Regions:
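Bacterial N-terminal signal peptides that target proteins for export
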Residues: 1-9
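Ligand-binding face of N-terminal immunoglobulin V-set domains in extracellular IgSF glycoproteins
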Residues: 24-157
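An acidic-aromatic substrate-binding cleft motif
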Residues: 159-247, 261-272, 277, 306
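The substrate-binding groove and active-site-proximal loops of carbohydrate-active enzymes
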Residues: 186-200, 242-252, 272-285, 322-327, ...
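Acidic (Asp/Glu)-rich catalytic clusters
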Residues: 212-213, 228-239, 256-269, 295-301, ...
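Catalytic domains of carbohydrate-active enzymes that cleave complex glycans
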Residues: 257-282, 294-311, 394-507
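Catalytic-core region of carbohydrate-active enzymes that cleave or remodel glycosidic bonds
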Residues: 318-408
Length: 507
C-alpha cells in the first residue's frame, strides 16, 4: 500500500473512533449529511470548519451542501459568498418537522422524537433571524481549478471561506443510479389538477423531475404504455425505464408488451416491468412467474424488456425472471448468476443492509447508497417512493399533513403495527427538496468520484477507501450497521478519493 493512501486510511480510522469530551460549540458549519435535532448539541467535529475558517473542496460539476447551525437565532442575515466564476450559490431556509412517534424497527433504528431539520425552501431574498441556514454551492463543469476565497456572514460576524476546485469533473445528471418512483395522480392532486396527462400536469411533474435529476436521481412513474408518450421527454440520458403492464389477463399482458416494444424500438433504453410488488406467498410467486412467462411469449425478456421482481432469488421463478430487486441477492447469488444475463439491483434501505429513507435517522443514511452502489456494482437503486403525499395504501384519499405530522406511511390505520416518518417522501409539495435528498446527492457524487478514480487504473485504491468506510452491506451485512454515523469520516474518505484523482488522473 502506497504511503499517501496508508496515511489517509490511518486518519480515516482515527475519525471512526469516538470523540473525546469537548464543550459543545455555539456555531457549526457542516455538510449535507449532518442532521441535528432542534435543541441538541451541535457537532464537536466538522469536516468543513476549523480554526475559524471554512474550507470547501469540490470537483468540477459537483454541488456541495453547506449547513450553518447556531444554538440560537441570529440577529441579521446569514449569507455565503465566493469569488469564483462558474460557481453558483443558492440559499435555503431549513425548517424542522415534528417527529412525535419514532419510526418502527421496519426501518431500522430511530433517533427518537424531536424536531428534525428536513424541509428546504429557496430563499433568494436571504435568510434572516434563523438558527440555521443551508446553501448549495454548485461548481460548474467549466470552473477554473485552484483556490478561491469568499466569506460567510452571520449577522455582524465574518468568517473567511476557502474553496479548492479540483481538476476532477463529474456529471451528476447522466445515467442516474437511483430510480425514484412516483404516482402522477399524487402530484396532480396536491396541485389541484386532474390526472389526465394534459400539458399542465406534465409541466408540474417536470418541476419535480428536474429537482430529482439535479440531485442525481431519475424520478419516473411505473405506468402503462398509453401514458408514456407525454413523459417520453423524461427518458433522457438513462439506460433503464420502468414499464408497467396490465396483468389482469394474458391478452392484456401481451398487448402491453408489444406496445412497449414498439414505443422503445430504436432506443438504447432497456425497459423493466414489476407486475407484482413484494410477493410473499407461494400463490403470489406463482403469479409472478406466470406473468413473466406470458411477457416472454409476447416478445419480452432480456435483454430489451426485463421481467423484474422485488424479491430474493427463489426456486419457483426458475429462469423466468431477468431482474431481481433485493439486497439479499448481493453479492451472492448475483455474482454467480450475472453470467447468465440476469441483473441484480436493490431497493430502499434498512440497516445493516443500507441506510434508511426515514426522517428520524442519522444524516449519513442516504449517503450510504452511492458508496454501497459502487462497492457492489449496482446498476440501479429503486426508491419507493419520492412523492408519497397521501398514504393511499393505509388512509385512502386522506391527505397527509406532512409539515405537522410526518408519519407518511402508517399501517396502524388498517390493523398493522409499522409506521415511518418520511417514508416514500424525498421532496415536499411545491417541489421543495428535503435534507435527505441532499444527503442522497452527496453519496451519488461520491460514487462518481470513486468511479473516476477507478477509470484511471486505481480500482484497488478506490475500493480500499470504500471498504474502510463500509466494510459490509447489502447481503453481506448482519447485526449492526458497519458504517460511521458522523460526517467527518465520510468527508475524510472523499478527500482520499480526490487526492487519488489528483495524483493519478490526468486533467
Amino acid at each position: 500500500m502506497k504511503a499517501p493512501l496508508r496515511r489517509g486510511l490511518a486518519a480515516l480510522c482515527a475519525l471512526l473512533a469516538p470523540a473525546g469530551c469537548q464543550a459543545a460549540p455555539e456555531l457549526a458549519v457542516v455538510g449535507d449529511s449532518v442532521k441535528v435535532k432542534e435543541g441538541a448539541d451541535l457537532p464537536r467535529r466538522s469536516a468543513l470548519y476549523a480554526g475559524g475558517r471554512v474550507r470547501l473542496r469540490a470537483a468540477r460539476g459537483e454541488t456541495l451542501g453547506v449547513q450553518v447551525l447556531l444554538t440560537h437565532a441570529v440577529r441579521g442575515a446569514i449569507a455565503l459568498d465566493l469569488h469564483a466564476k462558474d460557481v453558483h450559490i443558492v440559499a435555503f431556509r431549513l425548517d424542522t418537522v415534528p417527529v412525535r412517534e419514532p419510526s418502527t424497527s421496519m426501518y431500522g433504528d430511530s433517533r427518537g422524537p424531536g424536531q428534525y431539520p428536513d424541509v428546504l425552501t429557496p430563499a433568494p431574498g436571504g435568510i434572516e433571524g434563523q438558527p440555521r441556514a443551508y446553501f448549495d454551492v454548485a461548481v460548474g463543469p467549466a470552473a477554473s481549478p485552484g483556490r478561491h476565497t469568499g466569506e460567510l456572514r452571520i449577522g455582524s460576524r465574518r468568517i473567511p471561506v476557502e474553496l479548492r476546485i479540483e481538476n476532477a469533473r463529474i456529471d451528476l445528471r447522466s445515467d442516474p443510479l437511483v430510480w425514484v418512483y412516483y404516482m402522477p395522480g399524487e402530484v396532480a392532486a396536491v396541485h389541484g389538477l386532474p390526472d389526465d396527462d394534459r400539458p399542465e400536469q406534465i409541466e408540474v411533474e417536470r418541476e419535480y423531475y428536474e429537482l430529482f435529476r439535479r440531485h442525481g436521481a431519475l424520478l419516473a412513474p411505473h405506468l402503462g404504455p398509453h401514458r408514456f408518450p407525454p413523459r417520453r421527454q423524461f427518458m433522457k440520458d438513462v439506460r433503464f425505464w420502468p414499464a408497467w403492464v396490465d396483468h389482469s389477463s394474458d391478452a392484456n399482458i401481451a398487448a402491453d408488451v408489444r406496445r412497449w416494444l414498439e414505443l422503445l424500438d430504436g432506443s438504447d433504453v432497456r425497459a423493466f416491468s414489476i407486475p407484482i410488488d413484494e410477493p410473499r406467498t407461494a400463490e403470489q410467486r406463482e403469479r409472478v412467474r406466470h406473468v413473466a412467462e406470458v411477457i416472454g411469449k409476447a416478445g419480452g425478456g432480456r435483454p430489451s424488456f426485463l421481467r423484474a421482481v422485488t424479491d430474493a432469488v427463489h426456486p419457483v421463478y426458475g429462469d423466468s425472471i431477468d431482474l431481481y430487486f433485493s439486497p439479499l441477492n448481493i453479492p451472492e447469488p448475483a455474482n454467480e448468476r450475472r453470467a447468465r444475463g440476469q441483473l441484480f439491483w436493490t431497493y430502499n434501505g434498512k440497516p445493516p443492509h443500507a441506510g434508511s429513507m426515514i426522517i428520524d435517522t442519522y444524516g449519513v443514511a442516504l449517503r450510504t447508497w452511492g458508496w454501497i452502489g459502487y462497492l457492489y456494482d449496482v446498476d440501479l437503486w429503486y426508491a419507493w417512493e419520492g412523492l408519497y403525499f397521501r398514504d393511499r395504501y393505509n388512509r385512502g384519499a386522506e391527505a397527509t399533513d406532512l409539515l405537522n405530522d410526518p408519519v407518511s406511511f402508517d399501517e396502524r390505520q388498517k390493523g398493522g403495527t409499522d409506521f415511518g416518518n418520511g417514508d416514500g417522501l424525498l421532496a415536499y409539495p411545491g417541489a421543495l427538496p428535503s435534507l435527505r435528498l441532499k444527503a442522497l446527492r452527496r453519496g451519488l457524487q461520491d460514487r462518481l468520484l470513486l468511479e473516476q478514480l477507478e477509470d484511471c487504473g486505481q480500482a484497488a485504491y478506490a475500493r480500499r477507501v470504500a471498504r474502510a468506510l463500509i466494510p459490509r452491506a447489502l447481503g453481506e451485512a448482519t447485526g449492526e450497521r458497519a458504517w460511521p454515523v458522523h460526517e467527518a469520516p465520510w468527508e475524510e474518505a472523499r478527500h482520499l478519493v480526490l487526492d487519488g484523482i489528483e495524483r493519478h488522473c490526468p486533467p
